[in-house]
Amino acid sequence: LLCSFAVKAKEELLLGEKVKDVLVTGATGGVGSIAIMILSKMGYDVHAVTGKKDKNDYLKDLGAKNIIDRKEFEGESKLLEKGVWDGVVDTVGGAALTKILAQTKPGGIVALPGNAGGIKINTNCMPFVIRGVKLWGIDSSGSSIKRREFVWNEAAKLIDFSKVQTFTKELSFNELLDVYPKLLKGELSGRTIVNPNK
């Protein structure tokens, strides 16, 4: 939810200029799935990035307008590419972020809540200096109580919790040992919660 409000902030920063096209990476993961749901409910055209071709229907059901293969964000990037994205929720980070920044439109906001693709990026100043792109780190664990209360009040309006239940799994510590290799291979989707009392 914090990511979605970061993207929405572009409208306030640019005095009402409307956000239209929003990119969400790691779209089948827990954060990506919820971001798609929220951003589509906010009225944006959500473009979901995934490497899991069997999840297209799942992503469309969450509200994605378009599905993009993550391979589109591999390889070398120019200093600046055609501006495509008004906003981005990048749960992946790493090498793909370089290309994403180069493709973000003037004044665009890239919210970065994760680093599943790596902690390093190889970028340049051009997206920031020429286009005024903003890269916002999202740290939900360090948010104030006031901010958390605001977010949870908004969550009730923007999140379909019955859908969240369909992609959330609860595991015991013992079950985690079986699931962890799949996580490392990128074979999991949705949200996995470890319940120490299970």
Model-flagged regions — what are they?
Residues 1-41:
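Short internal alpha-helix immediately C-terminal to a glycine-rich phosphate-binding loop
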Residues 13-20, 71-85, 142-143, 163-164:
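Short, flexible, glycine-rich and Lys/Arg-enriched loop motifs at helix boundaries
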Residues 21, 45-46, 109, 134:
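Residues at the starts of beta-strands that form the adenosine-phosphate
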Residues 40-95:
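Adenosine-nucleotide cofactor-binding segment
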Residues 95-161, 196-197:
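Glycine-rich phosphate-binding loop and adjacent beta-alpha segment
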Residues 146-198:
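C-terminal hydrophobic helical "lid"/dimerization subdomain
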